[in-house]
């Protein structure tokens, strides 16, 4: 069974230990109040949409190529939500262009304990990502917002890069959109610093998703 290691925490049972680790996550974000505003907006959007749709709240993380940041955000967000017992959230990712799930992003997840397996027989390169619940792997592949696999109405759009935020002035069907840009680890591709930079970006995203879903768990 995969053992996903959370940044700063090193714990497996997030739900049972929420009161111990969440204050540390909050403390880590105290020095970036503008970031907390964006993260709190995402928390509010998820809770507001839950009142409208009653059942499943869909969150779509968007970056230009749907290759690195949006894929990392989808995986971390869904894994953390699942671990916290937040069963009404389904996370997705998309891009303004279709490329592929970058190997360096996959490596960053594997370094945290995820198991990633390439799926055979798919028209588009696809991977199954196994987190803390191996019975329900995530199906990850690069796609645009028009892909059939994505919700078309009443979803939350989270842009994870400035380029996607500018490139999608209107996102049809979105209940709300949140700008949550991350620096692109792509600049390190092909250099000795790549593994470290991707790990840093993965950890940053994981920490912020711990904050978002930790707040939601605390409100239930």
Predicted regions located by residue number:
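Short polar/charged helix/loop
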Residues: 3-220
């Amino acid at each position: 069974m995969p053992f996903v290691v959370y940044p700063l925490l090193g714990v497996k049972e997030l739900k049972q230990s929420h009161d111990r680790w969440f204050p540390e996550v909050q403390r880590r974000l105290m020095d970036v109040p503008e970031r907390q505003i964006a993260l709190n907006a995402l928390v509010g959007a998820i809770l507001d949409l839950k009142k409208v749709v009653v059942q499943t709240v869909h969150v779509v993380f968007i970056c230009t190529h749907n290759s690195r940041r949006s894929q990392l955000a989808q995986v971390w967000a869904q894994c953390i939500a699942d671990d916290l017992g937040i069963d009404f959230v389904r996370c997705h990712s998309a891009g303004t262009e279709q490329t592929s799930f970058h190997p360096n992003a996959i490596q960053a997840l594997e370094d945290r304990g995820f198991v990633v397996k390439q799926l055979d027989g798919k028209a588009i390169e696809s991977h199954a990502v196994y987190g803390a619940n191996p019975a329900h792997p995530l199906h990850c592949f690069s796609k645009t917002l028009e892909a059939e696999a994505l919700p078309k109405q009443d979803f939350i759009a989270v842009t994870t890069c400035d380029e996607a935020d500018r490139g999608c002035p209107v996102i049809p069907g979105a209940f709300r959109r949140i700008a949550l840009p991350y620096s692109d680890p792509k600049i390190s591709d092909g250099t000795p610093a790549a593994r470290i930079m991707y790990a840093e970006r993965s950890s940053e995203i994981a920490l912020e998703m711990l904050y978002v879903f930790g707040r939601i768990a605390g409100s239930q």
